[in-house]
A protein has these predicted regions:
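Secretory-pathway/luminal and periplasmic proteins that interact with or process carbohydrate-rich
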Residues: 108-117, 156-162, 179-193
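Substrate-binding/active-site groove segments that recognize
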Residues: 113-137, 144-155, 205-207, 232
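Bacterial N-terminal signal peptides that target proteins for export
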Residues: 13-25
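N-terminal export signals and maturation junctions of secreted/periplasmic proteins
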Residues: 10, 29, 34-87, 112-113
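Short, functionally critical alpha-helical segments immediately adjacent to catalytic or ligand/cofactor-binding
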Residues: 87, 95-111, 146-150, 173-179, ...
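Alpha-helical transmembrane segments
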Residues: 2-8
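Catalytic and substrate-binding regions of cell-wall glycan-acting enzymes that process beta-1,4-linked
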Residues: 55-60, 171-236
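Second-shell loop/turn segments in exported
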Residues: 69-76, 86-89, 112-114, 132-143, ...
């Protein structure tokens, strides 16, 4: 059945493929879940099918061709130096290492010496208070940064009580990582009296429409958070 779906995906045009995926998303999800797709480089029929689906999903992402190419190039080079550290940190804090690595790529493109004008630094671009809260003494140390970022994401996941699906919860965790848990909580409280019923789409709309002292004429802080969430999810999936 899964092989038939893959063959069909290759035989139809791109716009038709989008419709095809939407109609058969549940079937694809069930098959992939049952087969427990892995991103480890072990070549099996299942891994080939999973790789094909991943490529299709990436093709329909909102990333530009340049961004996709950059991600692939650095995945084959820079990521390899730190891959085991991502795997070990993710296992320690019960995360998927690909998810952790996707956050790091969006933050720093896996550059341990990355800095921003807002004084966040390192592989996971931690703020000074966040770094202190997870025991990171040197934000430019890639190992400390990876483990600190993993711990922080794990803590956020435990704190987030929003979203009506696992995908929604992941989006809320990412939003909190970028915007801060307090700001996300305040936004959720303004949307609905029952936080557990708030969806990511509702928060996304609220963030885009809300105003902040950090906004510029062309780019709002809320839009920045939405872009962060969507890009990480594109890199991750």
């Amino acid at each position: 059945m899964l092989l038939w779906l893959i063959i069909r995906m290759f035989k139809i045009k791109k716009i038709q493929t989008v419709k095809f995926l939407s109609k058969n998303a549940v079937i694809l999800f069930v098959f992939i879940s049952l087969m427990s797709c892995s991103k480890d480089p072990v070549v099996t029929p299942v891994s080939v099918y999973c790789s094909v689906i991943s490529e299709k999903l990436l093709a329909f992402s909102r990333l530009s061709n340049f961004e996709k190419q950059k991600f692939q190039e650095l995945s084959d080079t820079r990521l390899q130096k730190y891959k085991n550290d991502f795997i070990e940190a993710a296992e320690t804090f019960d995360l998927e290492w690909e998810f952790l690595a996707a956050v790091a790529f969006q933050e720093s493109q896996w550059n341990p010496k990355a800095r921003s004008a807002t004084q966040v630094k390192g592989m996971m671009m931690l703020t000074l208070p966040t770094a202190a809260s997870v025991g990171v003494t040197n934000r430019l140390d890639p190992i400390q940064s990876i483990y600190g970022g993993a711990q922080y994401l794990s803590e956020l996941r435990q704190m987030v009580e929003y979203g009506t699906s696992s995908g929604d919860k992941t989006a809320f965790v990412l939003a909190a990582y970028n915007l801060g848990m307090t700001n996300v909580k305040n936004a959720v409280d303004q949307i609905n009296g029952n936080p557990s019923k708030v969806t990511w789409l509702e928060l996304e709309e609220h963030l885009i429409q809300s105003k902040s002292s950090m906004d510029t004429e062309s780019y709002s802080r809320g839009q920045q958070t939405v872009d962060f969430v969507e890009r990480v999810r594109d890199y991750y999936y």
